[in-house]
Amino acid sequence: MQNEIEMLRSIRQSTEMGCSGIRAALPEAQNPAMQSALRSQWKEYDSIYAEADRLLRERGVRLSGVNPLAKYGSMLTAKLRVRSSRNTTARIAEMLVQGNTRGMVKSMQNLRAMGVLDPKVSSLSTRLLQTEQANIEEMKHFL
């Protein structure tokens, strides 16, 4: 059960940071197709976050979010990077590919380290991994 809780916390944290990053990038996106892709990714991350949150609550876990300073620092860095670039669409895509890649690595490490999990937790973890892979493929078109 402890492995399941750790996995769900990791999923929740990854999707919270994903939502935060997209929220920071969305106002900077000038390309309508990029805006649409970002909104779609945000919606999927939010759905996965809500499911992880629900499963944690079912297990009686007290929840806390990502450190607000970490989120603010990430948001500020993202905005500065985008604004300093001549091609904002490509820069946003690059940052999202990097973020999704970090998320995928963490997801795969967690899956290997934690072994067999409750089917609901395992399914949600796989869903996050597949989402991150799909997000990378989608962002490649904007590079």
Feature-to-residue mapping (PLM):
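Alpha-helical bundle segments that constitute or directly flank the non-heme di-iron/ferroxidase center
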Residues: 1-29, 91-115
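Alpha-helical scaffold segments that form or flank carboxylate-/histidine-based iron centers
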Residues: 3-11, 32-50, 89-96, 118-131
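Charged/polar, solvent-exposed surface patches and flexible loops
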Residues: 10, 24, 36, 40, ...
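Amphipathic alpha-helices that form helix-helix packing interfaces
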Residues: 11, 18, 25, 48, ...
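Short, flexible helix-adjacent loops and helix caps
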Residues: 23, 27-34, 57, 61, ...
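Conserved alpha-helical segments that form or flank metal/cofactor-binding pockets of metalloenzymes
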Residues: 36-72, 138-143
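Carboxylate-rich helix-loop segments that flank metal/cofactor sites and access channels
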Residues: 54-104
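Preference for long, well-ordered alpha-helical segments
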Residues: 92, 99-143
